[in-house]
Amino acid sequence: MALVKTKPTSPGRRSMVKVVNKDLHKGAPHAPLLEKQFQKSGRNNNGHITTRHKGGGHKHHYRVVDFKRNDKDGIAAKVERLEYDPNRSANIALVLFADGERRYIIATKGMVAGQALLNGAEAPIKAGNNLPIRNIPVGTTINNVEILPGKGAQVARAAGGSAVLLAREGLYAQVRLRSGEVRRVHIECRATIGEVGNEEHSLRVIGKAGATRWRGIRPTVRGVVMNPVDHPHGGGEGKTAAGRDPVSPWGTPAKGYRTRSNKRTDSMIVQKRHKR
């Protein structure tokens, strides 16, 4: 994997920086693990915009990724190849199990074709293996962490993502996330050893607006250049300031305002990610 700065043959390529991984599979994805993915463009069934700045972009299939990895315990597996996934920042790996079934998983850092993998409590502590947190040594770097046993990985799934297992106390373990938050997780929740691969993803430079549109992302218009009917910052004769503290189009404070409202799981957060 390497960062490649393109030659300035056009304005769009002048500042472009690409992540090149020669180990990725160049052919078609594994067809049985593909599903149709329809363009929703941020609209609901009424046609109303529910998520702004979405629309257009290249067509692509959804790759069915196994985030649970709990029904192949003890069955030896081998990484067949690494693939690009347009639906996420991390790369995925096509894994062949000894019983003949193939599945996609999130590729961990250092994973290569031909690597042996194992799921389950008896799996060795080696990058890419998946096992319950009760069987993982304290201090281990982990990724694809479950929040609820059997629900599937929900935390540390993006490119370069990871968490650290800090402690185990009774039925719960403490996990430190990249944000600095320390969270309690049941010891029967599963996690994968190591970090998520494609860690250089954050260093890429898109280079031009068109490449962002290929990804289905539409322009973000500043509220201060809108009309008053469209945004609280809008209006005024000529170029004017917002006239108030920054807010969203619906009046919610935009800078530093905490919006977490799930009090039911507050007891699972040992240390908040906020500094104060």
From Swiss-Prot:
- Give the compositionally biased regions (Basic residues): 50-59
Could you confirm whether the keyword Electron transport appears in this record? Answer: no
Q: What is the protein's name according to its record?
A: Large ribosomal subunit protein uL2
Organism lineage string: Bacteria, Pseudomonadati, Pseudomonadota, Betaproteobacteria, Burkholderiales
Q: Which GO terms describe its cellular component?
A: large ribosomal subunit
According to the record's subunit comment, the protein's assembly and interactions are: Part of the 50S ribosomal subunit. Forms a bridge to the 30S subunit in the 70S ribosome.
Q: Which one of the record's GO molecular function terms can you name? A: structural constituent of ribosome
Q: Which organism is it from?
A: Cupriavidus pinatubonensis (strain JMP 134 / LMG 1197)
UniProt biased composition (Polar residues): 39-49
Tell me the keywords, alphabetical order.
Ribonucleoprotein, Ribosomal protein, RNA-binding, rRNA-binding
A GO BP entry is: cytoplasmic translation
Q: What does this protein do?
A: One of the primary rRNA binding proteins. Required for association of the 30S and 50S subunits to form the 70S ribosome, for tRNA binding and peptide bond formation. It has been suggested to have peptidyltransferase activity; this is somewhat controversial. Makes several contacts with the 16S rRNA in the 70S ribosome.
Similarity field:
Belongs to the universal ribosomal protein uL2 family.
